[in-house]
Amino acid sequence: MSQKVLPTKINLIQFRRQLRLITVIKRLLENKREVLLLYLRTYASEYEKIYNEVNEEMKKVYESYLQAVASEGISNIEEIALSQKPSLEVSSSIKVIFGVKVPTIKLDKSTIPPKPFSDVETSPYLSESYEEMTEALNKIIELVELESTIRSLVSELRKTQRLINSIDNYILPFYRGSIKFIKQILEDRQREEFSRLKIIRRILQRRRESGSG
């Protein structure tokens, strides 16, 4: 590719200027990569924490549910569940983290349905399961938001790394090779010009010497 570059002093100056600019861009991208990695480590740690909390919450929900089934019977539990219409609503918006758009998700607590059963007429385990599930919902929503955030950050990190790789593997070698090529041609021309001048000086010197003789 360097051989297609016109070897002129102007091009040499321009290529050197562009190389400096590309080097600055690469440094900025590397800084961005480091910040993204820092955010990712922070969010991954938070995700692991919430994930473990959700697991513990859901274990409690499941244990209470199994005890409620044993007490009430699966058919009664299913009848209560089927009597309810889906009502949960979540709202989502976008926030920006270091130039990366990530979702925010919130549960509308007013849409959580009230208990569709009486505490007096049903097993206390059923009420316990309902309350534990209600508490777990917010953490589940938070977990979903964290997962989406991590995916967005990973996607941006991959794009940034691809740009850095492109600069390292293609752009920088092209500019460095082009500068080397232009310098070599200009130096060769300078040497040729210097040699021609020496020859001309010798010829002129001989003429002067022969004329004076």
From Swiss-Prot:
Q: What is this protein called?
A: A-type ATP synthase subunit D
UniProtKB keywords: ATP synthesis, Cell membrane, Hydrogen ion transport, Ion transport, Membrane, Transport
Topology of this chain in the membrane = Peripheral membrane protein
Q: How does it assemble?
A: Has multiple subunits with at least A(3), B(3), C, D, E, F, H, I and proteolipid K(x).
HAMAP family in alphabetical order: ATP_synth_D_arch
Family (UniProt): Belongs to the V-ATPase D subunit family.
Q: What does this protein do?
A: Component of the A-type ATP synthase that produces ATP from ADP in the presence of a proton gradient across the membrane.
Mainly resides where?
A: membrane
